[in-house]
């Protein structure tokens, strides 16, 4: 009973913070921008958050994080609009929605598909917020018991999950992560004062900025990939129709929404591609449970309801490892670490104990944000359709300009703009050779944290690496990491893993 009353008390504290006029305004702005970048193919939340990081300098930490979080889950909502109306997923997580969502639109049921996607996302978002609130206290209490060796082992496990869930071969994913960790060591060593991998270049003596790598790998590289492929935009020209599903539609969609919410909530916790796999896993489950699986791919409402719910639930539960353990499970959460660092906040269990207003304010803002997204998305569908008719070749110059302004304004450094372009070419080359860029950013952000924890553990143990084996928790986590990689390399698992990603594509 006391745990429940604590939860209610904490959520009421969060609502009192999130419902201030300023924070409601920032939440609305984040959700609106997020929906916009979700609707426009090729402008993801990663590039957008990177672009807006400098603006957060002038905001208070709570408002800044509420806005950035709104952009992330708003983009998941917006991606479904493009998937249904144009057959192009605005977000990687909306790929599965194109299969049945666009078929429904072609049958004159675009409104119902959009309505059920929005309602499913709203329900999943609300449930995921309750899950975050419920798991926050026990996970934070557990995290406070972790020593440096345990934290190091937990981050190794996180990176191994990212390896297993990354597209492409396991060795490629490990290679990309190692490059990310190597890049995290660039700059001056804070312990010895020695410069590492700077090659005498003073501009990088403070280390590489996470914004430079993120904007290059996910902003510029994405633009290059989009220019290369000529997308045929199969825009639905007919009337969208009634946005409110009828009773029969709601009855058909109810169970898939509940199952999708559960699947997405669990997979969203996993580092790497967990949130992306949620919608695909939901679609597979719905197809297996269906009385007539042949309906899928021809406009089955369950094929929209389940994946869209999983998509939004996963986007929100991804905040759990970040807020409780200080470990980002995906590239967007890695940028949230950057945003927190700007404001002098150390991600992890201390947020909840030392800054409860920020922690609970951010969680409560997700409820408000989900309600806003329902209000923003349905009435503005006409506007999004008009936007989608603008050819990409006319949009990309302004996107490039905004990316350059965003990077320049982080440190007022022209050199960083050039470096971003370099990382853009590097990211484009990686994609060409079948490497996935997201693990690199994860390796870069976790690399710094891992080095810090490794050093702390060795100082405590007086230089003995046995500390990682002596402690049962760190030993268990390292063994689990090893098992994960070995299992992923096994031929039978490797084939089914490749099959999953092939179908997801």
Report each predicted region and the residues it spans:
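Helix-loop-helix hairpins and the membrane-proximal interhelical loops
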Residues: 1-64, 140, 195-300, 385, ...
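Membrane-embedded alpha-helical modules
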Residues: 2-3, 115-228, 342-494
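Transmembrane alpha-helix interface/packing and boundary motifs in multi-pass membrane proteins
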Residues: 31-45, 74-87, 162-167, 261-271, ...
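Short helix-coil transition sites and intra-membrane helix breaks within transmembrane domains
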Residues: 37-46, 84-95, 127-131, 267-276, ...
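Re-entrant/interfacial helical elements at transmembrane boundaries that shape
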Residues: 45-54, 68, 83-103, 134, ...
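Membrane-interface alpha-helices at helix entry/exit sites of multi-pass transporters
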Residues: 62-66, 103-120, 291-303, 331-334, ...
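A structural-propensity feature for long, helix-poor, extended segments
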Residues: 72-84, 90, 300-325, 329, ...
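Membrane-embedded alpha-helical segments of transport systems
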Residues: 73-78, 119-131, 139, 183, ...
């Amino acid at each position: 009973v006391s745990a429940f009353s604590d939860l209610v008390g904490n959520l009421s504290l969060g609502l009192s913070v999130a419902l201030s006029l300023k924070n409601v305004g920032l939440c609305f702005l984040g959700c609106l921008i997020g929906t916009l970048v979700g609707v426009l193919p090729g402008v993801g939340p990663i590039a957008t958050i990177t672009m807006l990081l400098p603006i957060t300098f002038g905001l208070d930490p709570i408002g800044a994080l509420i806005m950035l979080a709104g952009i992330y889950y708003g983009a998941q909502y917006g991606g479904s609009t493009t998937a249904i109306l144009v057959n192009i997923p605005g977000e990687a997580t909306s790929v599965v929605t194109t299969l049945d969502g666009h078929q429904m639109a072609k049958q004159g049921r675009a409104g119902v598909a959009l309505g059920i996607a929005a309602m499913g996302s709203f329900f999943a978002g609300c449930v995921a917020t309750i899950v975050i609130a419920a798991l926050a206290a026990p996970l934070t209490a557990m995290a406070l018991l972790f020593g440096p060796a345990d934290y190091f082992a937990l981050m190794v496990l996180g990176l191994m999950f990212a390896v297993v869930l990354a597209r492409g071969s396991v060795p490629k994913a490990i290679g990309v992560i190692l490059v990310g960790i190597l890049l995290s060591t660039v700059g001056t060593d804070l312990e010895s004062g020695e410069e590492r991998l700077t090659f005498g270049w003073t501009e990088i003596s403070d280390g590489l900025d996470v914004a430079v790598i993120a904007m290059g790998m996910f902003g510029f590289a994405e633009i290059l990939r989009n220019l290369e492929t000529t997308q045929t935009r199969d825009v639905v020209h007919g009337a969208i129709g009634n946005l409110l599903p009828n009773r029969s539609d709601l009855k058909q969609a109810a169970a898939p929404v509940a199952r999708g919410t559960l699947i997405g909530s669990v997979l969203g916790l996993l580092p790497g591609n967990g949130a992306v796999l949620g919608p695909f896993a939901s679609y597979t489950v719905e197809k297996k449970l269906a009385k007539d699986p042949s309906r899928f791919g021809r406009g089955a409402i369950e094929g929209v309801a389940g994946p869209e719910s999983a998509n939004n639930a996963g986007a929100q539960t991804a905040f759990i490892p970040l807020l409780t353990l200080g470990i980002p499970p995906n590239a967007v959460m890695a940028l949230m670490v950057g945003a927190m660092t700007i404001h002098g906040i150390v991600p992890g269990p201390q947020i909840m104990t030392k800054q409860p207003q920020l922690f609970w304010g951010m969680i409560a803002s997700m409820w408000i944000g989900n309600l806003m997204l329902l209000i923003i998305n349905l009435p503005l569908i006409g506007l999004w359709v008009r936007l989608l008719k603008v050819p990409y070749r006319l949009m990309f110059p302004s996107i490039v300009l905004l990316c350059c302004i965003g990077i320049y304004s982080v440190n007022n450094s022209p050199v960083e703009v050039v470096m971003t372009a370099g990382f853009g070419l590097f990211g484009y080359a990686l994609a060409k050779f079948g490497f996935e860029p997201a693990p690199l950013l994860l390796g870069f952000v976790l690399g710094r944290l891992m080095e810090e924890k490794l050093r702390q553990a060795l100082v405590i143990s007086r230089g003995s690496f046995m500390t990682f084996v002596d402690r049962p928790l760190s030993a268990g986590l390292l063994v689990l990491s090893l098992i994960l990689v070995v299992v992923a390399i096994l031929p039978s698992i490797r084939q089914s893993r490749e099959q999953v990603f092939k179908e997801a594509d």
